[in-house]
UniProtKB/Swiss-Prot annotation:
Function: Functions as a (p)ppGpp synthase. In eubacteria ppGpp (guanosine 3'-diphosphate 5'-diphosphate) is a mediator of the stringent response that coordinates a variety of cellular activities in response to changes in nutritional abundance. Plays a role in adaptation of Brucella to its intracellular host environment.
Protein's gene: rsh
NCBIfam families per the UniProt record, alphabetical: spoT_relA
Protein name in the entry: GTP pyrophosphokinase rsh
Reaction(s) catalysed by this chain's protein: GTP + ATP = guanosine 3'-diphosphate 5'-triphosphate + AMP
Residues covered by the ACT domain: 676-750
Length: 750
């Protein structure tokens, strides 16, 4: 266990003017308070806050943060009080220690709710001071390092919580090394067999390639030294969780992975980053499509680096990251590292510096949005979503900021503002221009929702939205509209039925008959009659028990099969009732489900089109799973486009021609759909055969292949394939990208 003077010395190495008195007092106080307490492992409990403090010294944090780490469990697990800590260490440290205290005594309905409330308190505390986050992550990291002594069920619960919340939170805040270690430790307990298998394979691969990695490292170092660039080069290997996740999400085998090894180049200045990049690209061939400049355009979590991929000496792909040493420290420690470079020579606290970073700004915005909810379990699920997905930020005409997931549409925006606005939405202006409701919103868009009181959200909207709130509201509104429709039809049916029976009718007259009909209210009766579940004669008899039905029934005068009544709904049971097409009460829209294909022609699996108009796919095609839209072509019917088609820009100013359509695929569908893939491959023997083998292994048919451009190192080609759906197409593209022969592969739209 680290001694008192050793802790002070660790901090002095990076902060010579350390407040030794504060560290010594916190060390002694925490040690005395925890006393003889033991951890599950049998170690003294004080060893835990001491290890948490040690993790934070590795991140070069100030003595106040180290003191908070030493004290973080005292209020929860000892006789220490907030008042006592305030008196000894000041109210600021007392407040942060209390912010780290778990909620064990809440009267909540489930373990999940307790977890959610703990997380809510943590996030709200983080929003006030980033040091709460740093201590909590270090606390979780040490607990994960010692998780093996716990019961199996507790290990699994803590590991899953770490993978779901703490690892992505560390990543969002730019603390990549901590994120990776948390993921690896969690992976080990969540799926031990997979962890062991991947770890063993990586060890074998490292041993096999050790000499090659050393050669590349030496070659790079010599090139930089020869050109006067002071650089350090080190090889790196993907972590087991990263490898396993890629295999799972992209359907790849271990052998198909081609970027397990990479190199990190660290230099002194930004200018040296670009000089090093130029030397690398003039020495080796660059792989097209694999260059990313995060220095000129940093990531949301402040990560900055240049990424490029080259063809190495043995014609293998090698990924390189080029960054300054300052960028490397920020990539490793995230928000914590900003104090090292922005606070040198200053009396400011690191947490004040950290609140200026992009990553911390994101966290505050997320917390503001999430803290509005009251349901703790819903809060937990929403938090997980927010941690894992990118966001777009749009504005109302009055300047209110609305945060939405990437891929959101104006419909999502409308429901995010208010459910009533979503339900009454009929159109949208995006940046002053009327745009289709399926338009994907971008950062900074100003969205003005056009409303109508007569609007009812169509069920087809479900396929256009990206948020759970919008989807749930659409379902609720759709159910309500359908019930209202059936209720109106039931009202008309009963009016006619009571008229034929010679009995007076009103809604109030139905109330005495509710017990006999076993219905809860009058609206339930009307809807049941409208749906055909309840014969109108049963209702008349329930209200007037002495009534004798003398009408002609369907048994002696059957209706024609498939006849429709009002609202295009099948006639109610017990009555022959038909309204002619186009007559009073006829449906305003054609039921797409009733469309019957003409003999000899295959019906397109599309819903939402008029059966009287011809429908065709655009030249670039669309596959099931694509978000699609129909464009009305005067005199030529409807053309179906994938929503990402560049050709749709020609119709931006003609929203009246856009038609909401969706796929209508059933399990018996055996149709394949054409798609086009652009591939850039290494120009070497066997490359084409490997590409064809990937298509064949995935049960895809290549029906055309054309070479676009050929160079000594690379060749570009267009491949036309036939696939079942978007998932099938994406799997093929993913495996092409992972092939050692392929430098890039992407779908062609238009």
């Amino acid at each position: 266990m680290m001694r008192q003077y050793e802790l002070v010395e660790r901090v002095q190495r990076y902060k010579p003017d350390v407040n030794e008195a504060l560290l010594n007092k916190a060390y002694v106080y925490a040690m005395q308070k925890h006393g003889s307490q033991k951890r599950a492992s049998g170690d003294p409990y004080f060893s835990h806050p001491l290890e948490v403090a040690a993790i934070l010294t590795d991140m070069h944090l100030d003595e106040a943060t180290i003191a908070i780490a030493l004290l973080h469990d005292t209020i929860e697990d000892t006789t220490a009080t907030r008042q006592e800590i305030d008196q000894l260490f000041g109210p600021e440290i007392g407040k942060l220690v209390e912010g780290l205290t778990k909620l064990k005594k809440l009267d909540l309905v489930s373990k999940k709710a307790v977890q959610a409330e703990n997380l809510r308190k943590l996030l709200l505390a983080i929003s006030e001071d980033v040091r709460v986050l740093l201590v909590k992550l270090a606390d979780r990291l040490h607990n994960m390092r010692t998780l093996g002594v716990m019961r199996e069920d507790k290990r699994l619960r803590i590991a899953e919580e770490t993978m779901d919340i703490y690892a992505p939170l560390a990543g969002r805040m730019g603390m990549q090394d901590m994120r990776e270690e948390l993921e690896e430790l969690a992976f080990r307990y969540i799926n031990p067999d997979a962890w062991r298998a991947v770890t063993d394979r990586l060890a074998e691969l490292l041993e096999k390639n050790r000499g090659l990695l050393q050669k590349i490292e030496t070659d790079l170092s010599e090139i930089f030294e020869k050109n006067g660039i002071k650089a350090s080069v080190k090889s790196r290997q993907k972590k087991p969780w990263s490898v396993f996740r890629k295999m799972e999400t992209k359907g790849l085998s271990f052998e198909q992975l081609s970027d397990i090894f990479g190199f990190r180049v660290m230099v002194d200045t930004v200018q040296d980053c670009y000089r090093a990049l130029g030397l690398i690209h003039t020495t080796w061939s660059m792989v097209p499509g694999r260059f990313k400049d995060y220095i000129s355009t940093p990531k949301q979590n402040d990560y900055r680096s240049i990424h490029t991929t080259i063809i190495g000496p043995s014609r293998q792909r090698i990924e390189l990251q080029i960054r300054t040493r300052e960028m490397d420290e920020i990539a490793e420690f995230g928000v914590a590292a900003h104090s090292i470079y922005k606070d040198r020579g200053s009396a400011n606290n690191p947490h004040k510096i950290s609140t200026e970073t992009n990553a911390y700004a994101w966290l505050r915005q997320t917390i503001e949005q999430l803290s509005e909810g009251d349901n703790p379990e819903e809060f937990l699920e929403h938090t997980k979503l927010e941690l894992f997905q990118d966001q777009v930020f749009c504005f109302t005409p009055k300047g209110r900021l609305i945060a939405l997931p990437r891929g959101a549409t104006p419909i999502d925006f409308a429901y995010a503002v208010h459910t009533d606005i979503g339900d009454s939405c009929v159109g949208a202006k995006v940046n002053g221009r009327i745009m289709p409701l399926m338009t994907e919103l971008k950062n900074g868009d100003e969205v003005d929702i056009i409303r109508s009181k007569a609007q009812v959200p169509p069920a087809a909207w479900e396929s256009l939205v990206a948020t759970g709130k919008a989807r749930a509201a659409i379902r609720r509104a759709t159910r309500s509209a359908v019930r209202k429709q059936y209720s109106g039809l039931g009202m008309r049916i009963l009016e006619r039925a009571f008229e034929r029976a010679g009995k007076p009718f009103s809604k109030d007259i139905l109330k005495p008959g509710l017990p006999r009909l076993a219905r809860k209210d009058v609206e339930d009766v009307l809807a049941a009659v409208g749906r055909g579940e309840l014969p109108s004669t049963d209702v008349v008899k329930a209200v007037y028990p002495d009534y004798q039905d003398t009408r002609v029934t369907t048994q002696n005068n059957p209706a024609k099969a498939g006849e429709k009544g009002w609202f295009n709904i099948q006639n109610a049971a017990g009555m022959i009732f038909k309204v002619p097409e186009g007559g009073e009460g006829a449906a305003a829209k054609v039921d797409p489900a009733a469309t019957t294909p003409k003999p000899g022609k295959r019906a397109l699996p599309i819903r939402g089109t008029n059966p009287d108009l011809p429908v065709r796919f655009a030249p670039e095609g669309a596959v099931p799973g694509d978000r699609i839209v129909g464009i009305l072509q005067p005199g030529a019917g409807i053309t179906i486009y994938p929503i990402q088609s560049p050709a749709l820009t020609a119709y931006d100013d003609q929203p009246e021609r856009w038609i909401d359509v969706r796929w209508d695929i059933d399990d018996q569908m055996s149709e394949r759909f054409p798609a086009r893939i652009s591939v850039s491959a290494i120009n070497s023997p066997g490359s084409l055969a490997e590409i064809a083998q990937i298509a064949a292994a995935n049960d895809a048919n290549i029906h055309n292949l054309s070479m676009v451009r050929t160079a000594p190192d690379f060749t570009e080609m267009i491949i036309d394939v036939e696939v079942w759906d978007l998932k099938h197409l994406n799997r093929i593209i993913s495996q092409l990208k992972e092939s050692a022969s392929v430098s890039s592969a992407k779908r062609v739209n238009g």
